[in-house]
Amino acid sequence: MHPLKNILNKVIWDKRESPDDYVITFIHRGAAENIKMIPFEKIRDVGSSWFTYRDEAENETTIPFHRVTSVKNTRSGQILWRKRGVLV
C-alpha cells in the first residue's frame, strides 16, 4: 500500500484527527507555479493510487499520488508526508 494512502486514510478515519487542520499540495499544470493547495476537507474519495476532490464549482477531480508533493498539518506546522526531493 502506498504510504500516502495510509496517511490520507488516517486523517479521514482517525477520530483524533481533524481534516480541517490539513492541506494537500500537488502539481497542477496551469496553476500559479504549477502548484495547487487544497484543504483536506475537499477530498471525496481515496483509491489505491489517487484521490478525488471537489472544487468550488462542485466539479470532482482525480489526482494521482505521484503528483502530490506534501500533506501538512496547518495547526501544528508538521509535514506528515513530503515527496522525496521536494522542498516545502
Language-model-detected regions and their locations in the chain:
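N-terminal recruitment modules of adaptor/scaffold proteins
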Residues: M1-E60
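Short, compact, well-ordered microdomains
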Residues: D55-V88
